[in-house]
Amino acid sequence: MQVSDFHFELPDELIARYPQPERTASRLLQLNGNSGELNDGQFTDILDLVQAGDLLVFNNTRVIPARMFGMKASGGKLEVLVERVLDEHSVLAHVRCSKSPKPGTMLLLGENQEHEAEMVARHDTLFEIRFTSDKKVLDILDEIGHMPLPPYIDRPDEDADKERYQTVYNKKPGAVAAPTAGLHFDTEILEKMKAKGVEFAYVTLHVGAGTFQPVRVDNILEHHMHSEYAEVSQEVIDAINATKARGGRVVSVGTTSVRSLESAAQHALKQGTELAPFFDDTEIFIYPGYEFQVVDALVTNFHLPESTLIMLVSAFAGYENTMKAYEQAVNNKYRFFSYGDAMFITKKTA
């Protein structure tokens, strides 16, 4: 398939630049993967769509304030976007400035250039940066970093984004983009689901800035995915096995949860073993033709045209079903992308 097969026209006004006043106030487009049937509704309808015995799998990564501003010690402004925390004092980052810094270049980061760091090495398009102080990287980021809003939101981050560009169940810091399907859940709706007999499990996938990189080839088979770190614990494996045994569904909240679960499944298939814990980097690329091993239903936002995420949705719901759903979403003026509305999709099995 060609990347252009996943194109759709999106009016600029449908890109959500701010979240709704309440997390659960978004709309929800339901898509039945087998029949192609579409239903417009509200996000709170999800309480009727999940059933006792289902397992919801969330990504509990925490978005770090990964964007820093500063200058080279020799002069010249720069912007640093952390891609990955390497250890307590070092990061891998994208650096934007007029001239790329060479190894050994000293950087002064923060509004008042209060934190000194050294550009240690370059790895392709990323720079390894080491802070010289005894403070831990995550503490420095909390002090001087800005929330790394996606480029299409097209505005500076605000104080409210520290809360709203973060799930209510976030736990493990490391992401530089939110697992956005989870943004629709507040504590009240989670409690209602639990009361209904729905079970929860948590994976971790630290979403990288690569998630916003465009696909730069024409044929999707030539695309190479960026790498992200994922964790699927034994506790999650046990919950999945118990759910399948009782006839429940594994409902993935977000594409990052899908990629975590299916990475574990693919690893097990290659090893010739049962589903097992997975703690590793993943470059899994899911596109039409992929056979899902774990996930039965999916909660997800509306994704960018020609992105790997709309390809994943097409693999799950069927290509034609997905493109029709997106056409309906545009016609019915759903809000798109990170702060936008959501879909609830059941897997195409036939």
From Swiss-Prot:
InterPro entries: QueA, QueA_dom1, QueA_dom2, QueA_sf. It holds the Pfam family Queuosine_synth. Pathway: tRNA modification; tRNA-queuosine biosynthesis. GO terms for cellular component: cytoplasm. It catalyses: 7-aminomethyl-7-carbaguanosine(34) in tRNA + S-adenosyl-L-methionine = epoxyqueuosine(34) in tRNA + adenine + L-methionine + 2 H(+). GO terms for molecular function: S-adenosylmethionine:tRNA ribosyltransferase-isomerase activity. GO terms for biological process: queuosine biosynthetic process; tRNA wobble guanine modification. It comes from the Bacteria. It is found in: Cytoplasm. Coiled coil: none annotated. Its EC number is 2.4.99.17. Belongs to the QueA family. NCBIfam families: PRK00147.1, queA. Monomer. This is S-adenosylmethionine:tRNA ribosyltransferase-isomerase. It comes from Aliivibrio fischeri (strain ATCC 700601 / ES114). The gene is queA.
